[in-house]
Amino acid sequence: MDDDGGGSPGHYGGGGIHLVCEYCGHGSEYAEDDADNGFFTCRQCSAIHTSTQNTATNPFDFPMTPAHLSAHRRPTQPTPTPKPFPAPRGAATGAAAPDFDDLGEPSEPRDFATGANAWGNPEDVAARVRWRYVRGLQVILQRQLEALVERHRVGSLAASLAGTIWLRWVAASKVFDEMWVHKMLAIAASVEEGHSASKDKQSELEGDAQKSQSSYEFLFLRSLRMMLPVYSTLAVCFLACHVARETILPTDICRWAMEGKLPYVAAFTQVDKLLGSSLNDCPLSSRQLFRPTRVIGAWQLEAAAGSIAQKIGLLLPSVNFYLIAQRFLKELSLPIEKILPHACRIYEWAMPAELWLSSNPGRVPSRVCVMAILIVALRVLYGINGQGIWESIAQTENAVGSDPEASAPHSIEPDSNNSEEFDARELLCTLAASYDKIDVGHDYSKEVHSYLKYCKDVVFTGMTFSLEEEHLIDIFWDMYKGKEVMLLDENAKLCQEKLRTTNGVNKRCRDGRFADTKCCSTPLGNCALQSIKSKMEENGFCYVSPRKRLVSDGYLLYTRRESSGSLIYVAHADYYILLRPFAKLAEVDVRVLHSSVLKLERRLGWIEERVGRSLNTLQNLHDEASDDERPVSD
């Protein structure tokens, strides 16, 4: 091996490179061939090493004897200090980014940490890391807005608003505060003083400057991620869509970010293309700076957007109830012309506070409040108050279930004497069918091929492989594609044989699943009723028998019942059938939506009671005034 001392040390005496992970503390021995583009990856947590501890020695750093004893014998003279790397190009914060074709990659692999003086003093390191981090987040936000406009049909107004919100958010976070660097250095000094007591003299001599440099870098990065989290770009996108009155929900943003349709998980690869290589002006790579550990949930995303609006002093409107409710009704295949006007009246009448964004992560999301208003409107319009409508549907199926050619419950003939009951029956049947059609799963989870492609393009993007590994991956891909074609042919044949043997006997039960032959051997209505009871128990509900008579015309408020030492919700079957497709579409638990419905109904009842009292008071005042104006008879 020809080496003049400028590269990595070779393996002499069976030794290697001992690296200790900065994240999990796991140490392991590495060889030169284990490096990936000059970087070593932790075998415990897959983090990339930026600081190293070299336990091997380079024999070319010492004078060679004829017997080459210096490579095997402990040197008596002190180890010479290696020369620091030259200052990187484009170190100034105001330097222009290089062209895309000439990224200015370093000529030597960074398999060891840079020298103590390579990046200057800690103040310069903090300025470089901060400038690179803020510019990189702005690039990611720009890519996300482009994807929203081009792929998801978001108006250009949202993109223009996002720029203003982002600048105000950066200013409010005080990330460019002059005292920030001094605070971080003071924290780093206190941490080093705590560790200095446990260090011996030998450990202080081995790479102490490099460890101090690395600790400064990651201390700055942790502070920046607390002030400007990576997920704040998603929150700014949603906040801009909310202000622009778009129908984009937090669930949409999170799903697109998870599936790679919105640049987030793999967006760090685009930062280097626009800003150049991070090794030129920052000691940390783009993967370390902008790679998120996880995708934030929809609940936390809405709270983050509300927190940003609160910190920048932005007065927010309520959600665009009309368009969002119209979208939900369309996805559930419900009559928009009949339901939406009544829902809008309830919205204008109640105006619940949950329709505004909040920074409280424990509050119910705004989309749940929209769903609650729609459910209350449906209960008022169709009279779904536990009268046993679903049980009557099950009895109808039981009566016609013995005839294989009987029509499905969706096409039950209406009763001329009771059209309202028919409307409610059709509503529940439509909701039961829509519950099966709602698909809240990710696209990459539908088949193995899409999942493997997702892992290649999103999860493991930015990782390089050797030629042998790439060739091996291509072989495995070809083998998988061949087996996939064979499996598709076999599945098609099995489906055709199954259709011929069953001859169309399988029917869809009211709970949304297909009943097999064993289920259909029992009465069809009992099968559907027992299935819905089991589903209610799984979701924390207790089935209640239908009401025999209506006690009052007010709202039906359900209470909780104690069962096995815990409180569970009680509900009728028809109300649960109405509740669960809305909860699935909003991607929340059924109990959360049920609690929101009860809260809204209590608020409406309180408003109606106050209005009734006010009207009675006005009527009494009017009568008293009329009596006073009446002339006194002689």
From Swiss-Prot:
Primary subcellular site in the record, as a coarse category: nucleus
Binding site for Zn(2+): 21, 24, 42, 45
Region (B-reader): 51-80
MF terms (GO), sorted A to Z: RNA polymerase I core promoter sequence-specific DNA binding; zinc ion binding
Residue intervals of every RRN7-type zinc finger in the record: 19-51
Subcellular location: Nucleus, Nucleolus
UniProt domain comment: Although it shares weak sequence similarity with GTF2B/TFIIB, displays a similar subdomain organization as GTF2B/TFIIB, with a N-terminal zinc finger, a connecting region (composed of B-reader and B-linker regions), followed by 2 cyclin folds.
Protein task: Component of RNA polymerase I core factor complex that acts as a GTF2B/TFIIB-like factor and plays a key role in multiple steps during transcription initiation such as pre-initiation complex (PIC) assembly and postpolymerase recruitment events in polymerase I (Pol I) transcription. Binds rDNA promoters and plays a role in Pol I recruitment.
Protein name per Swiss-Prot or TrEMBL: TATA box-binding protein-associated factor RNA polymerase I subunit B
The species this protein was found in: Oryza sativa subsp. indica (Rice)
